[in-house]
């Protein structure tokens, strides 16, 4: 899978790591695995993950905070410590965790601390919540290599955090882009990411 960043800084240097394939993070013989990604507004992350071949389900939600049963208002108010995130259920025989990581890093700015564009706050932090030791190892290796190769031109601030309870967000947040393609934020922020995803990663889409 060629490396075509979709973040705010344009094209980074070519990265040899994206030519590698790796099944780390998969469970032998498993047809289903889950992974959790936080890359800014969960509407964006959900939209770029939903149509990938091998992805069975994407749920928007909250993770990494200290308050049980958070809701959107409290998370957006910075009162709970949670990040907006998505939980992806996928078939590792069709798409690997490493592939999903590549798309994650390509579709947001992992060098921006607690901010994605105009969305500011710890709830918009770039973070990974590995669910297995294999996922954690793969995530650390990718972050290290992207940093070594200076792919983004600035230090990566993506954190790797313990996978605490994932709280599924309110119903109206699910399938948000598909249900609201004409909404202003969707048109201005999400649609360009989805268009570039189709352009550069068309072979990974259904």
Curated annotation (Swiss-Prot):
Has an important function as a repair enzyme for proteins that have been inactivated by oxidation. Catalyzes the reversible oxidation-reduction of methionine sulfoxide in proteins to methionine. HAMAP family: MsrA. Keywords: Oxidoreductase. Residues 13-29 have a biased composition (Polar residues). This is Peptide methionine sulfoxide reductase MsrA. PANTHER family: PEPTIDE METHIONINE SULFOXIDE REDUCTASE, PEPTIDE METHIONINE SULFOXIDE REDUCTASE MSRA 2. Its EC number is 1.8.4.11. It comes from Deinococcus radiodurans (strain ATCC 13939 / DSM 20539 / JCM 16871 / CCUG 27074 / LMG 4051 / NBRC 15346 / NCIMB 9279 / VKM B-1422 / R1). The lineage of its organism: Bacteria, Thermotogati, Deinococcota, Deinococci, Deinococcales. NCBIfam families: msrA. Pfam families: PMSR. The active site is at residue 41.
């Amino acid at each position: 899978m060629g490396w075509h960043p979709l973040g705010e800084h344009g094209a980074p240097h070519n990265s040899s790591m994206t030519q590698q394939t790796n099944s780390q993070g998969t469970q032998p013989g498993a047809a289903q695995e889950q992974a959790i990604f936080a890359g800014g507004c969960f509407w964006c992350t959900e939209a770029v993950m939903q149509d990938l071949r091998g992805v069975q389900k994407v749920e928007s939600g909250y993770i990494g905070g200290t308050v049980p049963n958070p809701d959107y208002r409290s998370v957006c108010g910075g009162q709970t410590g949670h990040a907006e995130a998505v939980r992806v259920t996928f078939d590792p025989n069709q798409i690997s965790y490493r592939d999903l990581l590549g798309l994650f890093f390509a579709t947001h700015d992992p060098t921006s601390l607690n901010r994605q564009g105009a969305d500011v706050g710890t709830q918009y932090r770039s973070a990974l919540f590995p669910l297995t030791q294999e996922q954690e190892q793969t995530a650390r290796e990718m972050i290290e290599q992207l940093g070594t190769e200076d792919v983004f031109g600035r230090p990566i601030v993506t954190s790797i955090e313990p996978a605490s309870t994932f709280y599924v967000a309110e119903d109206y947040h699910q399938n948000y882009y598909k249900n609201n393609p004409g909404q202003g934020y969707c048109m201005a922020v999400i649609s360009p990411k989805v268009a570039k995803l189709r352009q550069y990663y068309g072979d990974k889409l259904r």
